Amino acid sequence: MAVAHTPVARTAANPYKVFIAGGCYSGLAAAINLLERCDSNAENPIPVAITIVDERDGFYHVIGSPLALADKKYAEKAWVEFKDVKILQRPDVQFLHGSVTKVDTATKTATLRESADLHERTETYDFFIGATGLRRAWPVVPQALTRKTYLIEAGRHIDAVTSSSDPVLVVGGGAVGIEMAAELKTVQPNIKVTLAHSREKLLSAEPLPDMVKDCALELTRAAGVECLMDHRLTTSKLIKNAAGQDAYEVEFENGHKMTASVVIVAISKSVPSTDFLPKEALSEEGLVNILPSLQLANKDIPNSESHFAVGDLINWSGIKRCGGAMHEGKYAGLNIHQIMQHELEGKEVKLNEIGEIPPMIGLAVGKSAVSYGPDGMNSGPQVMQVFFEEDLGFRICWDHLRLGGDPA
């Protein structure tokens, strides 16, 4: 593969500058795998300087949101400030708390707005990785941008759902709604939890066979959640219940009415967080068009081969999953290392490429889970253990990314 770079000797004073927008699963995977490869030749390591920008001040385990919004102890665990991500505490990595507002691919310059004072600054780079994911609404994910305010936000939510005699209503029977309802019921078994979905089957928006959707319903009911199918919410009005507490009078399109202590709307049209990229790089939905090598697909964009995109923001097949995001981040890191080696040593570039991703899912439902992929469907407590363990996959992801490992 031809790469349009002019070889320049690299030293500690003139390292390769890599700018990563987004510090979750895919962004951290890219950084860690790239550093590992650059350090692999102890006698002649490749000097790099990595900048990771994120709106949050830490790694937040997004998969764990349903449990983080049901259990205060777990909420403390699910958000780890970047200063406590051990493997990346090294002089060639800097974390910036802020948001990327613009990327100029021609000059290889990123503009970002710092969270502390809204000051705008620019950073130049040799390689760019977009890993900012999708913007998801509350309460699908917390909206707080610091660990401190997140714990307050999560705590208030948990207090609200645990302090009333009326049932908690979760609206939306996609993966998030199912997991939120089931986690809440499992952690707080004394609360009545109702899940309402506008369609005949749960997971109706996903390209999954009916047996998976039916199994999800069976497991949700077995977890103790009341499921209302074909119930589309029309109105939700704040009232005082019989005990004088704030509650909601809810009405559905079919005429069914109920009183709920809290209404959790788990229907979220997630929006790609890609405004900072050139329009020419994006699909109509705002996802990033990529080559299988994870580089920008549009060759008319200046320096497209130096710009990568990974994780939920890419326009690619498959259901958005953190396993895929970590894999893509790894490949982006390895591919950037390949290009560096080509520049420095003239080595032939052999880029790693992702393949088409078939529909697959792992869904936690209380103490059980259902999984589906090319090998078919499995369900039960043993699936929960394999896919999520006791903490909705926190340890699995933390250890897979090696976030607690020693920095090189």
Question: What is each stretch, according to the model?
Answer:
Residues 3-96, 182-207:
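Beta1-alpha1 glycine-rich phosphate/pyrophosphate-binding loop at the start
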